[in-house]
């Protein structure tokens, strides 16, 4: 077989393999497509949240309607909800942290003491 025939066979097989396994799509354009899907998900969330009747605060993880953000439940039932008081706020505002693998918030409290 001549060199040009081998090159022709090689490029033909490579073209078939690339088409079959979407090599070029994943290698050159896969990230752009993935980012576009994330924007679509965010717009779907926005559209869904506008249709949920809630006059207070709509929890993003559970879509529960609560009085204030600190009242949101954790998305998973096995999580423990820990409240971290906001130091800058005069009222009882807090940041919610959901912890998995324990039965209480002692680890979060230890980390808070270390950070202050």
Swiss-Prot record:
Keyword Transferase part of the UniProt annotation: no
Keywords on record: Signal
Cited function: Probable component of the endoplasmic reticulum-associated degradation (ERAD) pathway.
Organism listed in the record: Coprinopsis cinerea (strain Okayama-7 / 130 / ATCC MYA-4618 / FGSC 9003)
Family membership noted in the UniProt record: Belongs to the LCL2 family.
GO biological process: ERAD pathway
Record bears the keyword Signal: yes
Protein name: Long chronological lifespan protein 2
Residues spanning the signal sequence: 1-19
